[in-house]
């Protein structure tokens, strides 16, 4: 994949989440302008852009046609555990707590959370 561009409802709130999350995974800030920002790792980059007012409604919902979630590689199970603690400490919503860290199934060690627009984000440890 080359890049993904997400339109967001609140650029600053999304910048705080994605900036922190991606930097924890080794991404570096790549581009920045008044209505957007991107982070890059290796040959892939993720872009967030402030959606214009006429396009803020209806709110995003992952069960509609389109994007369900974004999944990222973790370095280890320890990184998944550490990120779970940090997500909680920062007040972000961790999903599927009752099945964590195996909400994706047996042998699928991951944390699922939501960004400020409720886009589901997954961080997956390498499988054995």
UniProtKB/Swiss-Prot annotation:
<protein>
    <recommendedName>
        <fullName>Uncharacterized protein YqjT</fullName>
    </recommendedName>
</protein>
<dbReference type="InterPro" id="IPR037523">
    <property type="entry name" value="VOC"/>
</dbReference>
<dbReference type="InterPro" id="IPR029068">
    <property type="entry name" value="Glyas_Bleomycin-R_OHBP_Dase"/>
</dbReference>
<dbReference type="Pfam" id="PF13669">
    <property type="entry name" value="Glyoxalase_4"/>
</dbReference>
<dbReference type="InterPro" id="IPR051332">
    <property type="entry name" value="Fosfomycin_Res_Enzymes"/>
</dbReference>
<feature type="domain" description="VOC">
    <location>
        <begin position="1"/>
        <end position="126"/>
    </location>
</feature>
